[in-house]
């Protein structure tokens, strides 16, 4: 997605050898116009897939996921990273390792929001090692629902996340694919949409 790649080049900051900071438009402050455009691209890509739910993980996946859900006219569910006293029955959980925060979290979704009839599109802000998506796939599987695809805003293609998900037989659609970071710059691969 050219608009997204341009925004990454303009407002993204490279930290160290493999971290891209995009807090100016995605991970802290949100550019809703860009998120709306991202949502439309995912909706167009999966228009014929019969998606019934969009699922993400809190927090930075929420903005692109809600706009994708709006464009598809389906509900959006976000997995919670912290225990909630109001979530007491029928909780679906998975352990997820965060590459950025370098911590293990138990993420959860109330089972009443997913059923075996659901066809789910997972949306997330980043794909690095694939652990967040893998955890969501596990939770969705516990409900008996089908994961139709994983939509990613920014993929770090030099890490193993895509291969992990595709080896599970699930399609990955990334709107910006980073080939590498080199001398303080980043290089893109061709995006999926």
Curated annotation (Swiss-Prot):
GO biological process: one example: xanthine metabolic process
CDD domains, A to Z: PRTases_typeI
Species whose genome carries this gene: Streptococcus pyogenes serotype M5 (strain Manfredo)
Protein's pathway: Purine metabolism; XMP biosynthesis via salvage pathway; XMP from xanthine: step 1/1
Lineage: Bacteria, Bacillati, Bacillota, Bacilli, Lactobacillales
UniProt-annotated binding residues for 5-phospho-alpha-D-ribose 1-diphosphate: 128-132
Free-text function comment from the UniProt entry: Converts the preformed base xanthine, a product of nucleic acid breakdown, to xanthosine 5'-monophosphate (XMP), so it can be reused for RNA or DNA synthesis.
Similarity annotation: Belongs to the purine/pyrimidine phosphoribosyltransferase family. Xpt subfamily.
Enzyme class: transferase
Keywords, sorted A to Z: Cytoplasm, Glycosyltransferase, Purine salvage, Transferase
GO cellular component: cytoplasm
Protein name: Xanthine phosphoribosyltransferase
EC number from the UniProt entry: 2.4.2.22
Gene Ontology MF terms: xanthine phosphoribosyltransferase activity
Catalytic activity of the protein: XMP + diphosphate = xanthine + 5-phospho-alpha-D-ribose 1-diphosphate
Subcellular location: Cytoplasm
InterPro entries in the cross-refs: PRibTrfase_dom, PRTase-like, Pur/Pyrimidine_PRTase, Xanthine_PRibTrfase
Subunit structure: Homodimer.
Gene3D superfamilies linked to this entry: 3.40.50.2020
Top-level division of the source organism's lineage: Bacteria
Residue sites binding xanthine per the record: 20, 27, 156
């Amino acid at each position: 997605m050219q608009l997204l790649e341009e925004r990454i080049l303009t407002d993204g900051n490279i930290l160290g050898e493999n971290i891209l900071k995009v807090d100016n438009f995605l991970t802290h402050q949100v550019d809703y116009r860009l998120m709306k455009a991202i949502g439309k691209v995912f909706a167009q890509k999966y228009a014929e897939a019969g998606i019934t739910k969009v699922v993400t993980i809190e927090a930075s996946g929420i903005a692109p996921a809600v706009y994708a859900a709006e464009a598809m006219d389906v509900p959006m569910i976000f997995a919670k990273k912290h225990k909630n006293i109001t979530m007491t029955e029928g909780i679906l959980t998975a352990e997820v390792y965060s590459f950025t925060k370098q911590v293990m979290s138990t993420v959860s979704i109330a089972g009443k929001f997913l059923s075996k009839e659901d066809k789910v599109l997972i949306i997330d802000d980043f794909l690095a090692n694939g652990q967040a998506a893998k955890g969501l796939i596990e939770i969705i599987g516990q409900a008996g629902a089908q994961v139709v695809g994983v939509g990613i805003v920014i993929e770090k293609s030099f890490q193993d996340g895509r291969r992990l998900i595709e080896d599970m037989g699930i399609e990955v659609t990334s709107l910006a694919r980073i080939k590498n970071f080199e001398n303080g710059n980043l290089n893109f691969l061709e995006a999926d949409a």
